[in-house]
UniProtKB/Swiss-Prot annotation:
It comes from Mycobacterium tuberculosis (strain ATCC 25618 / H37Rv). The keyword Protein biosynthesis does not apply. Keywords: Hydrolase, Magnesium, Metal-binding, Nuclease, Secreted, Toxin-antitoxin system. Mg(2+) binds at residues 8, 101. It holds the Pfam family PIN. Belongs to the PINc/VapC protein family. Probably the toxic component of a type II toxin-antitoxin (TA) system. An RNase. Its cognate antitoxin is VapB27. This is Ribonuclease VapC27. It is found in: Secreted. One of its GO terms (cellular component) is extracellular region. GO terms for molecular function: magnesium ion binding; RNA nuclease activity. The gene is vapC27. The keyword DNA repair does not apply.
Amino acid sequence: MKPPLAVDTSVAIPLLVRTHTAHAAVVAWWAHREAALCGHALAETYSVLTRLPRDLRLAPMDAARLLTERFAAPLLLSSRTTEHLPRVLAQFEITGGAVYDALVALAAAEHRAELATRDARAKDTYEKIGVHVVVAA
């Protein structure tokens, strides 16, 4: 059985926003496969969609509807991992802003998902967690 495909915000936004410079490339890469937002990327993608420049910004309900329609059920971090999150992060020596990338990677790892990204900086954290990373190009 093929592992689920998870995407982070760096893939979700160009997939959803037609005027994004990477839209065509990401849509071609995606090829209409079922994909799920992963961990913190769900909230982050919603945040970006609702704070884009005025002519592109979505109303909150429109953003929620778009995320529900375009993506499979989100892959979220288990309560067990969340309960021990500081210790888990410390074991991987993850600090600062990389914590948010780790939330995405930990959720992907728990669901045995491939994690698609376009973010070279986050990729290092994802790989540190041990998730299988795919570069969406």
